[in-house]
Regions:
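Short secondary-structure capping/turn segments at boundaries of alpha-helices and beta-strands
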Residues: 51, 76, 313-315
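Extreme N-terminal starter segment of soluble prokaryotic enzymes
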Residues: 1-5
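Conserved phosphate-binding/catalytic loops in two-lobed NTP-binding clefts
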Residues: 266-299
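C-terminal edge-of-domain segments
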Residues: 194-202, 206-210, 304-339
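Glycine-rich, anion-gripping cofactor-binding loops and their flanking helix/strand elements
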Residues: 40-60, 287-304
């Protein structure tokens, strides 16, 4: 985690040092006025608009030891989206109050404020309605559980609806704790929350929360390019109604560990790449689509299905083939939990 920390007075710098001690596992760059710039503090640059902009887009949190007004004026020109803006927090220079100003849920500002307040002996000033009313916060839960939010406008609608009553909730994964206030089991209604990897819409307006638990198994001819692999994967997922945001990994046999097109596909899609030996793939249990030709080349009767299941639980997509690329997909074990 990385953050930029801003202080504008000598006393503010003292509080900034306490913040850095509290967040010792963070990568934090502190800034202050040039006359106070010492002990690792970098001088604030000018003009302000040009100085804060690049920092805003490069950190996960911006922490101001200042007035709220100063912080708001400095970050306002750089706001883009609640999906991408960093957490913005303000502390008074005595470190008595910690105020999350921006990205309280998706950016994690609320949780960071609570953690800082506990460490500093300060008061976290939380103003988001779901938090102060003890209701389910859909965007915070999604971030904490590694789920993509399919629609931010619908997330906003759900956040408003849980303040008025219970919103129906449906999950393809086992729910192993009680539902929080604001959610109730249901599979129909005007507005509801669905947790799963499929692009299903059980409610008239369905907010889909997509856990990243799908592992691809990919086989391909030598020299297959990135776009051919992407087209084969997208076709296989679309045919089974699987949201691409659910994919976390692509796996294959170790003979493909240097396959440029496959590696390029993984990089561009933000996927980890895993490669297994023929012995490791043969050890995977299940019913697979065999190929004597593949076995003669690789030593194992099926690469894509076995690779997908090597560290997963349920095969979602059996072997599909397109343009010399074979694709399978499997889901890891996953559970829905509410604190």
């Amino acid at each position: 985690m990385n953050a930029a920390l801003f202080a504008y007075s000598r006393r503010g710098c003292a509080t900034a040092r306490r913040i850095m001690a509290a967040l010792a596992d963070w990568d934090i760059q502190p800034y202050t006025m040039e006359r106070f710039a010492e002990d690792g503090f970098a001088p604030l640059g000018r003009p302000a608009r040009e100085f804060y902009g690049p920092i805003f887009g490069d950190v996960q949190a911006m922490i101001f030891v200042s007035s709220v007004g100063l912080a708001v004026r400095e970050v306002a020109p750089h706001l883009k989206s609640k999906a991408t803006d960093p957490a913005v927090l303000v502390l008074d220079e005595l470190g008595q109050y910690v105020i999350p100003v921006l990205s309280g849920h998706i950016g994690g500002a609320n949780e960071l404020a609570k953690a800082l307040a506990a460490s500093l002996g300060a008061q976290a000033v939380i103003t988001t309605a779901t938090d102060i009313n003890g209701r389910f916060s859909v965007d915070a839960w999604a971030v904490q559980n590694g789920c993509a939010i399919a629609s931010l406008p619908l997330a906003k609608a759900v956040s408003a609806a849980v303040l008025e009553g219970d919103v129906p909730f449906l999950s393809d994964f086992p729910v192993v704790t009680d539902l929080p206030r604001g959610l109730a089991p249901g599979d129909a209604g005007a507005l509801g929350v669905y947790v799963g990897v499929y692009e299903k819409t059980p409610f008239a307006k369905t907010l889909r929360l997509v856990p990243r638990v799908v592992r691809l198994g990919i086989g391909c001819r030598k020299g297959t390019d990135e776009e051919t692999i992407r087209a084969a994967v997208n076709e296989a997922l679309a045919a089974h109604g699987i949201d691409r945001r659910a994919v976390k990994c692509a796996a294959s046999i170790d003979l493909k560990a240097e396959e440029a097109g496959l590696l390029a596909y993984c990089r561009s899609e933000g996927l980890s790449a895993e490669f297994y030996t023929a012995d490791e793939l043969r050890a995977v249990r299940g019913e697979f689509t065999p190929s004597e030709f593949v076995k003669s080349i690789t030593g194992v009767d099926n690469v894509c299905e076995r690779a997908a299941l090597r560290n997963a639980e349920t095969l979602l997509v059996k072997k599909t083939a397109r343009s010399g690329v074979t694709v399978a997909a499997a889901a890891e074990h996953w559970e829905v939990r509410f604190a």
